[in-house]
Amino acid sequence: MITLFRKPFVAGLAISLLVGGGIGNVAAAQGGPPKSGVFGENEKRNDQPFAWQVASLSERYQEQFDIGAAVEPYQLEGRQAQILKHHYNSLVAENAMKPESLQPREGEWNWEGADKIVEFARKHNMELRFHTLVWHSQVPEWFFIDEDGNRMVDETDPDKREANKQLLLERMENHIKTVVERYKDDVTSWDVVNEVIDDGGGLRESEWYQITGTDYIKVAFETARKYGGEEAKLYINDYNTEVPSKRDDLYNLVKDLLEQGVPIDGVGHQSHIQIGWPSIEDTRASFEKFTSLGLDNQVTELDMSLYGWPPTGAYTSYDDIPAELLQAQADRYDQLFELYEELAADISSVTFWGIADNHTWLDGRAREYNNGVGIDAPFVFDHNYRVKPAYWRIID
């Protein structure tokens, strides 16, 4: 551990004992990590304090960057709400603000889930990230249907293709305008476009791209700036930004857009990672590359799978996960947050893609590759909201 970038958490622990449940929680909260540095089975499962009994993550990093969590509206009550208020000072909607959630049919808006998240963030003085205005997935098909009811991508007539392009851009602009005007006083950073780079190189051949070329990216940012104002912070968000080839493709795109005057404020690094991948060196290189363009960096969807890719051989229950594997995860979280602190001047936010291990999209991936049975455990709080070894490593 490099102590230069770490600070004691005694003060935060004292506060947590006062607000986290009273005298009855003192013994649990003072338990801390085992002196050996490795959790035994019973110690791992039952002897660690609950998330609401320990020092706050957001207070620990308040001088460096925001600590956020992705949420669904139903998680804003009970224990999960208690954990959110204690550990996080930033929120993002996991699904409730995606295009298919907000405008499933043209002109028909569904604000209920998104509004609930906005109101929770406002009530508890939290920062709010918006995810996402434009994406190739979870976008309703009506965006890409022409006025005759045909798929725009199938059109071959040049004049009709141009008309379809303008219609799609108009629909996108209207969607962005409506959303940004509604939430601009609450949202502090916007994922304007998401996952536009293809893993195989170049731009993703989405319907957006096939119909408009790169114009949809440019117009999306310009529209968000127009209706959000200069104070709106606008991000281009993607996964695997640590992969050199994909990083370079994203860098070249962003550099070109900036040279055209497109208002981009930063890059969102999703950071869906694994214990053994990517390297800290590649992670550092990605942040530094976009910092060189004068851009902010945000870690937007952090989770750390126990497995490689694909996640074959997944454990079938939480109790089957070896203590040594959770310790390896803790070591990697430690290295990662050490890097984040070192580069804190260039990283404004670190958001986990969930609250605790009992709700993660990675469980679906584990089941997909293991005959319908499998779980993952990517966060610093376990499936019962107890702290994991990773928590103790990043709170010190």
From Swiss-Prot:
Taxonomy of the source species: Bacteria, Bacillati, Bacillota, Bacilli, Bacillales
Secretion signal, residue range per the UniProt entry: 1-28
Main location, first listed in the record: secreted
Annotated family: Belongs to the glycosyl hydrolase 10 (cellulase F) family.
Domain GH10: 51-396
pH-activity dependence text: Active over a very broad pH range.
Enzyme Commission code(s) on record: 3.2.1.8
GO molecular function: endo-1,4-beta-xylanase activity
Pathway info: Glycan degradation; xylan degradation
Catalytic site: E195, E301
Keyword terms, alphabetized: Carbohydrate metabolism, Glycosidase, Hydrolase, Polysaccharide degradation, Secreted, Signal, Xylan degradation
Protein name: Endo-1,4-beta-xylanase A
Source species, domain of life: Bacteria
A Pfam family assignment: Glyco_hydro_10
GO biological process: xylan catabolic process
Cellular component GO terms held in the UniProt record: extracellular region
InterPro entries associated with the record: GH10, GH10_AS, GH10_dom, Glycoside_hydrolase_SF
Catalytic activity, reaction form: Endohydrolysis of (1->4)-beta-D-xylosidic linkages in xylans
Gene transcribed to yield this protein: xynA
Subcellular localization(s) per the UniProt record: Secreted
